[in-house]
Regions:
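Positively charged n-region of N-terminal signal peptides that target proteins for export
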Residues: 1-5
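Exposed beta-strand-loop-beta-strand "reactive/processing" segments of non-cytosolic proteins
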Residues: 48-103, 166-216
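Short, non-transmembrane alpha-helical segments in secretory-pathway proteins
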Residues: 24-66, 130-173
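Cystatin/cathelin-like cysteine-protease inhibitor module
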Residues: 103-109
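Acidic/histidine-rich, surface-exposed loop or edge segments in extracytoplasmic proteins
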Residues: 109-137
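C-terminal motif of bacterial Sec signal peptides marking the signal peptidase cleavage site
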Residues: 17-21
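Hydrophobic membrane-insertion alpha-helices, especially the h-region
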Residues: 10-14
Length: 216
């Protein structure tokens, strides 16, 4: 339940800037599943073929620009959402994708930590990071820099953008306690106006979630 509430919150935040430019038109569950699996396999370098699909609805308004917003004046409408989850055979969700039913747009995608496998080198890096005391803050700054670079490299490859702008979404924040692994979020802006919120994990350097804040 908590996971679903978190996902719905992320989608509501996305709606405030997300434009419903007509892409594929109204889609059904089968098409939502196809879109989600393609997205997961591309963005997370996975090879999934099976998923379950669940429908939900959220109330929205349109502002003066035509953007979807979750509060406003005038008549509201219900927008259908598809939640596609991989795999369907287990209660542990490895990947989850939220798709707008009216256009086929991906709003949000995430992966579970169970899908992450650290290399031996990354495990040693995590242990060294955890036990270090005197230079821990410097090590954390260095880790953050490497994580930002990983996000930049990912955006170049997956978002088809040669010069993405990567902004720190949690600028100045540091974990309150030492951790072997930690996550951090970045805003990624492309030259054609797309905006994403991308969550990364250190030391795997893997993307954990992608929120589409503004589409093409």
């Amino acid at each position: 339940m908590k996971r679903k509430l978190f996902l719905l919150t992320a989608i509501i935040l996305s709606f405030s800037l997300f434009l419903t430019a007509c892409k594929q038109g109204e889609i059904d569950e089968a098409k939502a599943k196809e879109i989600a699996l393609n997205y997961v396999n591309n963005m997370f370098d996975a090879n999934e073929t099976q998923a379950s699909v669940e429908q939900d609805q959220t109330e929205y308004y349109r502002d003066e620009t035509g953007a979807l917003v979750t509060s406003g004046d005038g008549n509201s409408s219900l927008e259908r959402l598809y939640f596609v989850r991989v795999p369907e055979e287990t209660s542990i969700i490895q990947y989850e994708v939220a798709i707008l039913g009216s256009t086929g747009e991906v709003l949000y995608a995430s992966r579970g930590t169970s899908s992450i496998r650290l290399t031996d080198a990354q495990k040693k890096q995590a242990e060294a990071f955890y036990v270090e005391t005197s230079e821990w803050e410097d090590l954390h700054v260095s880790a953050m820099q490497s994580l930002r670079q990983a996000c930049f490299d990912w955006a170049k490859t997956k978002l088809d953008e040669s010069r993405p702008v990567v902004l720190d979404a949690n600028r100045g924040e540091m974990p309150g306690v030492k951790q072997r692994q930690f996550g951090h979020s970045f805003y990624v802006v492309t030259r054609d106006g797309r905006v994403y919120s991308v969550s990364m994990q250190w030391p795997s350097m893997q993307v954990m979630s992608i929120e589409v804040i503004h589409a093409k």
